[in-house]
């Protein structure tokens, strides 16, 4: 199958002709595949992904495996086993607030003069965890997805990879490929949204960036770990078609196109069997059918007992060592993996399974040139340099999504606006014992007070600094001689102080209200919740503040920091709304750049936004203390008494559900405004053996330069039954100067044109009928569409 060639944007017909001819020559020379066979082939040497700039040589799997075999050949069994389990239960790391979250110890085999330098694994998706502020605290992956900028996503991965490389970290535990099945999902901010195709593309670009820096990426959490409540004792019930079409597709993509080096099994069970001992999903599907060649590592403490089924089912590495918090967990217990030699002697585990696991781990390290001359672990190496900080600010700005701009209230015009009010505790410094630690929630400190630049859990980092919205706006307002007033105190009930806020801001020319919601992993308590959100309501009763202020001043802009959709009962009462997500350490500068027009907003929503009851799926949610009591008695980790999550919605997640049920959301998938006006026209599409080639003309009819995102949706041929009405299958971001136009080229490859057939137990490309192609700036725009016939000989 062919991966997309690098997109071009141009107004020159000659360049288009030359480009088209070049593409045809390239495509003819490459062998294409039309379905996933027993082992998915490696991607073509020339592809969109391989055309990205890199400065690191990556070996082929064949060469890596040969080197690994020679390395392992003289080693006794106990040395091979030592490669399969961690030696740090993370207590040391967390207490010091610095260090690897998982590691393999180095060793020296004297008889063969064999040296192994060890392996360091570390979180995560927003930068180097436990780095004590010596590296960038990045935006959330959900913000990354908001940019819809392929080159930007790759560069984020590349710079993050370089930071990990400098510190001697072999494996970065990212990206998270789970789907925002429910907007309440606690770790939704760690992923790339609610659409499998978008997650596939974003994940692959991120993986390529990381691994082009010489660091192993880790695709997680395999699979169906789409909620936090009872995650260690839950059962995701997913039918075969849905499993392959939605939940395995992103993993297939990062393996096929990203060549990802490692995959992490999740805590939950799928169809009754916990993932770390699910032979069907790990060994048969991931390794054999999909053709994954790297190593499989458990999520931390996802080994629940001493059953040899875990390693026999295909798991290669147990992290951080020992079994998990089962009924008799004893802290540093490593009994299971460290005594694998007993299982081999008792013939419960075959020695060739040990050999295979060790081979996969060492081969992956050889592939990324980590076996010789790799940096020693040193978390104090500073990568928080000016260049990286400047880029993080750009990402923070580019990931803001403008949702409403009535009367062009934005950008702030300093000829009109002389006084700004900044309200809402989310705009100001945080109230935590350690202001740089975003996992500061305890029973004594259960409320989140202050700005939310990131969620909580293993995905966060220790911030060296944080530019709050108040700081960023105040600094920028001074340049325009605009007065700033503010109020950030909460009442004793933990609510916004409405009376004082009104008094301070009533005569302001514009009121900026910062509102937030917070979520994360289940092991941390915040606002009475353990991970998943209770509701989509914003914190601290800020809805009441917004409504009351709107009665006396209509010039209100609400900026939302949240892990996804929130309720907007005041939507029609304010003039401006911005979704800012979790933008990282440069949050305040990024939002100031947008508010004052220094950056034209170009972000788009990577999820559909509506009321809780409108979505396909919900999450069983109880108070945190009630969940803990129930779990201790009935649903301990790895318990056979599982909480069931039935994925009965089938293929209809995200925008697809709203299309099926004809529900009009508050904001469609892909929605996002700009300070200029874009128009799309001249949709053309041509079906070829390699895939579908689409062209769209993008015109900037406004007075400001800007970037536009073209989204492509497809309706599959009618005979593909019980399939979504439209599926998202392509996008590109193009920069267009004011008064000019460009032609946006989008390629949809063979795999993306395929659907999973339960009849043939494989992905199949339609051989008859026609596709309907839709082009627009969001799922709600259907102005441009055309039909393309399928050719049977493809």
For each feature predicted by the language model, list its residue ranges:
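Glycoside hydrolase catalytic-domain context in secreted enzymes
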Residues: 14-17, 22-781, 793-794
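Edge beta-strands of extracellular beta-sandwich domains
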Residues: 784-788
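Short, low-complexity, Lys/Arg-enriched N-terminal segments of secretory-pathway carbohydrate enzymes
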Residues: 1-11
């Amino acid at each position: 199958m062919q991966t997309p060639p690098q997109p071009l944007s141009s107004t020159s017909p000659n360049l288009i002709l030359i480009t088209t001819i070049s593409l045809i020559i390239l495509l003819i020379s490459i062998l294409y595949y039309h379905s996933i066979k027993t082992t998915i082939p490696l991607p073509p040497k020339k592809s969109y992904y391989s055309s990205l700039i890199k400065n690191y040589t990556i070996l082929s799997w064949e060469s890596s495996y040969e080197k690994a075999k020679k390395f392992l050949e003289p080693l006794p069994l106990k040395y091979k086993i030592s490669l399969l389990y961690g030696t740090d239960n993370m207590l040391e790391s967390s207490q010091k607030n610095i260090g690897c979250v998982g590691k393999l110890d180095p060793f020296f085999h004297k008889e063969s003069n064999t040296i192994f330098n060890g392996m360091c694994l570390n979180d995560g998706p927003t930068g180097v965890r436990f780095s004590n502020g010596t590296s960038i605290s990045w935006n959330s992956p959900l913000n990354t997805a908001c940019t819809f900028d392929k080159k930007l996503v790759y560069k984020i991965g590349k710079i993050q990879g370089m930071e990990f490389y400098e510190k001697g970290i072999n494996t970065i535990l990212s990206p998270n490929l789970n789907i925002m099945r429910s907007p309440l999902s606690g770790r939704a901010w760690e992923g790339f949204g609610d659409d499998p195709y978008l997650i596939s593309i974003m994940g692959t670009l991120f993986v390529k960036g990381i691994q082009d820096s010489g660091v192993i990426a880790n695709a997680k959490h395999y699979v169906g770990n789409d909620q936090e409540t009872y995650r260690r004792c839950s059962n995701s019930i997913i039918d075969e078609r849905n499993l392959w079409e939605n939940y395995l597709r992103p993993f297939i993509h990062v393996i096929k196109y990203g060549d990802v080096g490692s995959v992490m099994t999740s805590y939950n069970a799928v169809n009754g069997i916990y993932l770390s001992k699910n032979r069907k999903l790990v060994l048969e599907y991931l390794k054999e059918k999909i053709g994954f060649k790297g190593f499989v590592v458990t999520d931390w403490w996802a080994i629940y007992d001493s059953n040899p089924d875990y390693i026999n089912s295909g798991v290669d590495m147990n992290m951080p060592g020992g079994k998990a918090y089962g009924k008799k967990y004893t802290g540093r217990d490593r009994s299971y993996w460290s005594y694998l030699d007993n299982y081999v002697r008792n013939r419960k585990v075959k020695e060739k399974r040990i050999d295979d696991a060790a081979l996969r781990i060492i081969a992956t390290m050889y592939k990324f040139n980590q076996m010789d001359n790799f940096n020693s672990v040193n978390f104090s190496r500073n990568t928080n340099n000016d260049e990286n900080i400047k880029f993080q600010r750009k990402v923070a700005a580019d990931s803001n999504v403008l949702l409403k701009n009535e009367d062009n209230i934005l950008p702030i015009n300093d000829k009109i606006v002389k006084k700004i009010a900044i309200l809402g505790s989310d705009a100001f410094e945080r109230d935590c014992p350690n202001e740089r630690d975003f996992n500061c929630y305890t029973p004594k400190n259960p409320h989140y007070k202050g700005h939310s630049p990131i969620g909580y859990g293993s995905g966060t980092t220790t911030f060296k600094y944080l530019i709050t919205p108040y700081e960023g706006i105040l600094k920028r307002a001074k340049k325009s001689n605009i007065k700033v007033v503010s109020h950030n105190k909460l009442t004793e009930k933990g609510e916004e102080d409405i009376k004082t806020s009104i008094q301070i801001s009533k005569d302001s020319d514009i009121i900026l209200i910062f509102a937030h919601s917070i979520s994360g992993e289940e092991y941390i308590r915040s606002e009475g919740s353990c991970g998943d959100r209770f509701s989509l309501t914003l914190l601290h009763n800020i809805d009441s503040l917004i409504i009351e202020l709107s009665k006396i001043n209509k010039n209100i802009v609400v900026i939302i920091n949240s892990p996804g959709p929130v309720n907007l009962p005041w939507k029609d009462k304010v003039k401006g709304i911005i979704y800012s997500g979790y933008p990282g350490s440069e949050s305040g500068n990024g939002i100031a750049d947008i508010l004052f027009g220094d950056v034209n907003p170009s972000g788009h929503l990577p999820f559909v936004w509506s009321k809780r009851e409108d979505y396909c799926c919900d999450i069983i949610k109880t108070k945190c203390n009630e969940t803990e009591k129930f779990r201790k008695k009935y649903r301990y980790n790895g318990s056979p008494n599982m909480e069931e999550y039935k994925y009965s919605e089938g293929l209809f997640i995200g925008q697809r559900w709203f299309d099926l049920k004809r529900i009009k959301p508050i904001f469609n998938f892909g929605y996002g405004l700009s300070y200029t006006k874009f128009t799309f026209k001249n949709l053309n599409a041509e079906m070829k053996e390699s895939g579908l080639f689409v062209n769209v003309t993008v015109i900037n009819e406004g007075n400001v330069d800007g970037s536009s995102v073209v989204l492509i949706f497809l309706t599959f041929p009618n005979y593909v039954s019980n399939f979504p009405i439209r599926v998202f299958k392509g996008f590109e971001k193009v920069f267009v100067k004011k008064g000019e136009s460009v032609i946006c080229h989008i390629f949809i490859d063979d795999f993306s044109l395929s659907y999973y057939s339960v009849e043939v137990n494989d992905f199949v490309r339609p051989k008859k009928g026609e596709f309907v192609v839709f082009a627009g700036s969001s799922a709600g725009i259907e102005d441009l569409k055309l039909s393309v016939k399928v050719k049977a000989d493809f």
